[in-house]
Amino acid sequence: TGWFKTDWLCEWKFNEERFPDPKGFIQGLKKKGYRVSLWQLPYVAENAEQIDEARKNDYIAPLTKKQDSEGSNFSALDYAGTIDFTYPKATEWYKGLLKNLLDMGVTCIKTDFGENIHMDALYKGMRPELLNNLYALLYQKAAYEITKDVTGDGIVWARSAWAGCQRYPLHWGGDSCSSWDGMA
């Protein structure tokens, strides 16, 4: 998260103090044989730079009631909204956020989270009860498509999954609990 404009606040923009020339930095790493993957998530925070645009254009599904925050940045409940991948305009908006990064030379996006959505939100294309498991597939598909379009290689670094996600490589089994229940 050290690349974020604001620590732990995903706005799909580099911190200008740490990275005054992100494109130059990425290109310098590339010349040394490194490839850059950036961590991000599919939720927009209340104080994110994009919140007004996201709400105005229905890029995040509007909530039907006020959510109680858990006080951390590790749950959809802590964010103002979930990007609505059932809405094509929201998907294109998200792809545009990633395209800006990929155009700088980023080669892979870590599509973290996606296993939780706001269950009290009004998604344009599907009821939340049906979308809940399918969400990871739609999320990874969007990131995969724009990555393939820009870089020529369709690679994402995904954690959450649902049937069909295997067509959008690569997946890792991280963040699982070290318990018998966590392995279920």
Which residue ranges define each predicted feature?
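Catalytic-domain carbohydrate-binding cleft regions of carbohydrate-active enzymes
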Residues: 1-184
